Amino acid sequence: MRSHNDFESITIRLASPERIKEWSYGEVKKPETINYRTLKPEKDGLFCEKIFGTTKDWECYCGKFKSIRYKGVVCDKCGVEVTHSKVRRERMGHIELAAPVSHIWYYRSVPSRMGLLLDMTVNQLKSVLYFEKYVIIDPADSGRNRGELIDEEEYHGYLDEYGDKFVAGIGADAIKELLARIDVDAEARMIRQKIQDKDKISDKRILKRLEVLEAFRDSGNRPEWMVLDIVPVIPPELRPMVQLEGGRFATSDLNDLYRRVINRNNRLKRLLALKAPEIIVRNEKRMLQEAVDALFDNSRRKRAVKGKGNRPLKSISDMLKGKQGRFRQNLLGKRVDYSGRSVIVVGPELKYHEMGLPKKMALELFKPFIMKRLVDLDLAPNIKSAKKKVEAEDKEVFDVLEYVVKEHPVMLNRAPTLHRLGIQAFLPVLVEGKAIKLHPLVCHAFNADFDGDQMAIHVPLTPKAQLETWMLMLSPHNILNPANGHPICGPTQDIVLGIYYLTSELPSEPGVPLKSFSNLEEVHYAIDRGVVEFRTKISVYHQGKILETTPGRLIFNTILPEGYAYVNRPLSDKETNRIIADVYDKYGPAKTVLMLDDIKKLGYRYATLFAPTISIEDIRVSPGKVGLVGDANKEVEKADSEYRKGIITNEERRKKVIEIWTKTNDLITESMFKELEKDKGGFNPVFIMAASGARGSKQQIRQLAGMRGLMAKPSGEIIELAIRSNFREGLSVLEFFISTHGARKGLADTALKTADAGYLTRRLVDISQDVIISEDDCGTEESISLGVVKEGENVIVSLNDRVFGRYTAEDVIDPVTDQVVYPRNTLITREVGQKVENLGYDKIRVRSPLTCESKQGVCIRCYGMDMARLIPAEIGEAVGTIAAQSIGQPGTQLTMRTFHIGGAASAKVQEKEHKVSYTGIVNNINGRLITNEKSQSVFSRRGSIVIQRLIQQYKTEELSNLRVENGQKVDKGELVATSPAGENITSEMPGTIHIENGLFRILGEEAVIPVKTGTIVNVKVNDITQPNQPLAEFDPYNEVGISEIDGTVQWMDLEIGKNVRRDEDLRTSNILLKVIEQRREKLNPRIAVISGGSREEYSVPVDAIISVQDGDKVKAGDILFKIPTVAEKTRDITGGLPRVDELFEARRPKDATTLAETDGKIEISGEIVKEKRVLYIHPDNPDLEKVKVTIPIGKQIRVRNGDFVKRGDQIDDGNLDPHDILRVKGVTALQVYLVQEVQEVYRLQGVHINDKHIEVVVRQMLRKVLITDSGDTSFVNQQQIDRLVFNEENKRVIAEGGSPAESVPILLGLTKASLNTESFFSAASFQETTKVLTDAAIKGKTDNLMGLKENVIIGHMIPAGTGTKKYKDIAVFKSAYGDLDRPLEEEEEEEIPQAIAEESDAEE
């Protein structure tokens, strides 16, 4: 067989009968396997030595030839060739079938390839193949068509009438004949002609048929090969038979399946020889067809063939499928030698790059190295005795072990390996005992703890492997998280506590002067004598100046690198991490690692000296709690009475109650924390643990000492009975019972969601695994715009954080001097980002993977910085896999998050008013305002309030000597004018100058506040507003419909009992009128308000509660109906993970919103078509047609007659459908939307993921285009094609003077995109294995082995990192004794450790 390294690509095709014979070494004629007495294979049976090769090395079946001397001799007596027994793994046989059978993959798969070629349905095919109906092959003059089905009677009728001219057949024979008669070229031409004549493609089946025909034409496959005359028999070692103790045999299911085929085939041969009646022969042929079906794909048949114990037998297809199949079990994941696993324990004495390796394990893992060393030192004469010495554990073995292990890195892995930091390399340090010792600071990366976790250890053997392990995987190279570039080695728990204690400060007594010291030694001496404590405030002479600090902080600062600014503040875990990141940035990884070890030592030491413990006395309940709970009870009572009077609905009451308790809980938490902070002078152990970030969170402590709060039901609904006790006071029985709900949900969720997150990661890896950095610069002109992320006016992500690690796509220009500060393609480091921010930019254009035009993978400039090392990415970096891991890994983390808070619900307090936290000026109020009875201005439709920050304001006469002009941008601290008194006036923050009406203003950014219908506005245009002044008030629980005129109400298409339900509340006797869905009737529910000649109509959606009766009088601004907003479910990644999933899978949401297809004016027609309302959009351009929009009756329409909409505006309520965004707004809008939405979910959980990782995945989802017009290209309409392949083909066609194809971009979800990759190996190993392989075989696909997965499957080195193609062509020059004369092969062979080579010789 060929070596697995001497090919670049693999093609898969249908096998012709000749090809199957070529593979075969002989025909299997008997169903026998082995002789049960001699246990030797039967001749001509399924294990026959003559066909498949000898079972014993260098020995024939009868024993005439025994020795390697006779290699290649074929025994004249038994016919067996003398050779290796290994050939039984590769030699195939065959079975000559007495009648052709159809291959199940090609007729039973959806869509059936055979059916498409013959233009028959699967059922029609089945009835021919299973001998139920005849198919016409040559109709003669009968007037019937070829391929039509007829029954037995008709067949005989036609035969009598037309004689031999009329040909029809039954069974696979007939199908084979039909397939052989197909002229693929002519048929394909005919269909293309048909499509062009039809103009628009109506029939999808025609297109599918064309695709299959052209696949056969281009691949060189013949259609009749889908029907088999010969069945190949796979090598016997791949379907083994083994003897169990007790003399029984275990055998592979395939042998049973082959046996059935051979039995039936032999029986059929006998029947044909005996010229048996047709009906018997047909039955046997049908059974043969079923036997072959079962052999190839047993699970696809309705009634699978069962073996012992009623278990379906595993067919060839089942061997490949699923997690236990060949692909995932044996090709993508293998067990490896030189590995071991053991429990881990903490190793506080280790350095960052070390791990403790138990001597017992080391002895076994390094065995060959030890044996070689023993022989080298003449401690053993040969390998065999060295082996005995090692097994006897002699004293000298341990001396040698120390030497062998020294500087030989090993890899540690903790399952589940969710990201690349789950495997890291360390230098082993030999330890006693049986547990592996792990450095405490690497735990976070492995997500390991010491409660019984196990880790696996692997030894890299060859020098090359050791070198890579050393250079790339050693733990000091992995101190940053590849997902975001933050340190992942930060201290946790005890260490944090120790550092916080060391750097905190006791309040100094007033009036007592500070003790002074002249240097660090004096301070140490004073501590030892007990004169000062670590946390006492002192003054000390340090680095040339007097400092007020504490001894603890002085000690901490000694471990920081030289020249680092003095840290004079208490350090929590976040602060410590910030310092680590800063040191990494300024001093590089080497200094950082040394500092980490020092932090570990300090932390442990001072945590031990501080020795905090928690007693029940430390959990202090705030004295104000009783009052707060009392107030809350009163408010709940008030809400109840409002409900009983009918002022509010039950749903509103429920929401109010939940909000009251949420607010109360927050207040209690606050007062409790204040109480804890005061306790013990700020050193209450519970408080310190939370404040330092060592253990526990505000949420958890609130449950210990505040109140447990609201709990959620398993459905995610919040129970309105709040738990008023905490764990310190103890819960009542009822409270305890309510608690169990949430706690149990937490545990169940954890189990389920972990699997979900794992599956999400698997799909992400599959779609993005072939994205590898392939070149330096793809030369694209495209780019994306990145800016500050804000929520309201709070900056969530600064510009510096967002653009960090990217390349600029345009020159960055100083707006004041107009000079280029940073040219295009500058890498944005922290400094560059800061400078850009200081120039006043709030967004800039940067290169992005989304717009990269590399043919394979992405380029360095579009990708930017490698977040794990903060240097530009290098060619060969597998950025796709890193992206997938970065998104998937937190998914799993987050799923486990619910578990720790114990199911306590976290609801958001609903805001009732719009306000901003700064002084502002109202620039505009967009929307329709009407004045109600109380003279308030009310929005009758959706609108917005535009407010601009007012930074400073002066009268112009108060200023002299203006330094700026109207409209100019100014920076913070920039001089804008001087006062008459000569004082300088500077800008307090970046802004824009605005001078008019005698006023000089510096204005900040505009904020647009969207406002819903029914909002009451408290401000006017040009008003100046104060911080937190209510600008507008609204009902947080309901959307409302408002009358715009005074008049009389008329119900239209609203009928009680049909589409209006009368709900009576039993507790209050209040009556609610609720609009319900009406399926059968064409009702268009509306409320009209009539006033004299004018009339306004308002559409009423499903679930609305009607507030007015037919004939009521209403005033402008009155509420006609309310729509309750959905109750807040608990906000948790349980909501989040499915959201990420649906975004990446590009699922269409259930109630998708409708987007305006064009700019224009709305006309609501009032027509109802198929339970949908019809609207029209009239474009501005009168030449264009009006656009028809249909909206389900039940949905609330956001627009009114005569409103102007822009392309892409939402016309009704609902969720955005990504496919609609792509169609209406284009690719860029969709990319931005997807990245933003995914980030939103993770940000809510406080998880940082760099945008570029999400962009890499989104890029893969948008790789395909859909052909709308094939032009002169080889594409078929409606075919999905890779964008790059499409562009190449179009270039080719244009160069030849043809007309190019046209296409639209399409969005594919993860699963679809993975199954549509160019590589069939990658797709087949992902999902739907048989379908992928069927398709690939027919198309004669070639896999160019570009991605990682397909290379792992084949057994090649992956084309990433040091395996990148460009590195393969490098020869190594050695300046030693002329060894460049030797060919490279010899070099390779020498790399095997000597001991292993010798050991294998010794065994032979």
Curated annotation (Swiss-Prot):
Residues 1384-1404 have a biased composition (Acidic residues). Zn(2+) 1 binds at C60, C62, C75, C78. Pfam families: RNA_pol_Rpb1_1, RNA_pol_Rpb1_2, RNA_pol_Rpb1_3, RNA_pol_Rpb1_4, RNA_pol_Rpb1_5. Binds 1 Mg(2+) ion per subunit. Its EC number is 2.7.7.6. Zn(2+) 2 binds at C778, C852, C859, C862. InterPro entries: DNA-dir_RpoC_beta_prime, DNA-dir_RpoC_beta_prime_bact, RNA_pol_asu, RNA_pol_N, RNA_pol_Rpb1_1, RNA_pol_Rpb1_3, RNA_pol_Rpb1_3_sf, RNA_pol_Rpb1_4. Residues 1380-1404 are annotated as: Disordered. It catalyses: RNA(n) + a ribonucleoside 5'-triphosphate = RNA(n+1) + diphosphate. One of its GO terms (biological process) is DNA-templated transcription. GO terms for molecular function: DNA binding; DNA-directed RNA polymerase activity; magnesium ion binding; zinc ion binding. Keywords: DNA-directed RNA polymerase, Magnesium, Metal-binding, Nucleotidyltransferase, Transcription, Transferase, Zinc. Mg(2+) binds at D449, D451, D453. Its cofactor is Mg(2+); Zn(2+). One of its GO terms (cellular component) is DNA-directed RNA polymerase complex. The RNAP catalytic core consists of 2 alpha, 1 beta, 1 beta' and 1 omega subunit. When a sigma factor is associated with the core the holoenzyme is formed, which can initiate transcription. DNA-dependent RNA polymerase catalyzes the transcription of DNA into RNA using the four ribonucleoside triphosphates as substrates. HAMAP family: RNApol_bact_RpoC. Belongs to the RNA polymerase beta' chain family. This is DNA-directed RNA polymerase subunit beta'. It comes from Leptospira interrogans serogroup Icterohaemorrhagiae serovar Lai (strain 56601). The lineage of its organism: Bacteria, Pseudomonadati, Spirochaetota, Spirochaetia, Leptospirales. The gene is rpoC.
